[in-house]
């Protein structure tokens, strides 16, 4: 399969910072879904991992954590997804990323894509939504549920 990866942390201005590569199709673990990636987003974690990680000799690292796509196969323990489902997710930092045609993702961190969103919109949500949630409820300790929250608008910045 085609992917975009790197084999050493070069400055982004270097033409070899990101490379078009060919990789074998990912193998599924029991809880995985195989996703044909339709859209991805770029997050600060992509930049940080690329700057700090050097793959083993002859290996490539594929970046990309937020993505949306179509399920192509399911692992033996997957119960909530089937082939053809449209999904979105934030992948795992310890696995190959979403900047590839196919990505193996733990189904327990994926969700069915809302019908009201296209693939690009869905791919833009996972890490930003997690960041907003953690900021509001873990850092600022906003009580859940917020009384009158349905009528509130939070503007930051």
What are these regions (language model features)?
Residues 90-154:
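NAD(P)H dinucleotide-binding glycine-rich loop of Rossmann-like/cofactor-binding domains
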Residues 1-4:
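Short structural boundary motif marking the start of a folded domain
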Residues 24-41, 51-94:
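Glycine-rich beta-strand-centered segment in the early N-terminal region that forms part
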Residues 7-11, 40-42:
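Short polar catalytic/cofactor-binding loops
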Residues 13-24, 53:
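Short glycine/threonine/proline-enriched tight-turn/helix- or strand-capping micro-motif at secondary-structure
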């Amino acid at each position: 399969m085609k992917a975009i990866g790197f084999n050493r942390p070069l400055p982004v201005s270097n033409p070899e910072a990101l490379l078009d590569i060919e990789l074998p199709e990912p193998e599924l673990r029991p809880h995985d879904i195989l996703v044909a990636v339709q859209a991805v987003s770029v997050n600060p974690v992509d930049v940080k991992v690329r700057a700090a990680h050097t793959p083993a000799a002859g290996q490539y690292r594929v970046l990309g954590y937020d993505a949306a796509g179509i399920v192509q196969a399911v692992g033996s323990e997957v119960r909530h997804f089937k082939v053809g489902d449209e999904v979105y997710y934030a992948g795992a930092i310890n696995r190959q990323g979403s900047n590839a045609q196919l990505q193996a993702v733990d189904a327990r961190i994926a969700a069915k894509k809302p019908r009201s969103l296209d693939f690009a919109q869905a791919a833009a949500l996972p890490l930003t939504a997690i960041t907003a949630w953690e900021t509001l409820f873990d850092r600022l300790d906003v009580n859940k549920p917020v009384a009158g929250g349905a009528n509130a608008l939070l503007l930051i910045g």
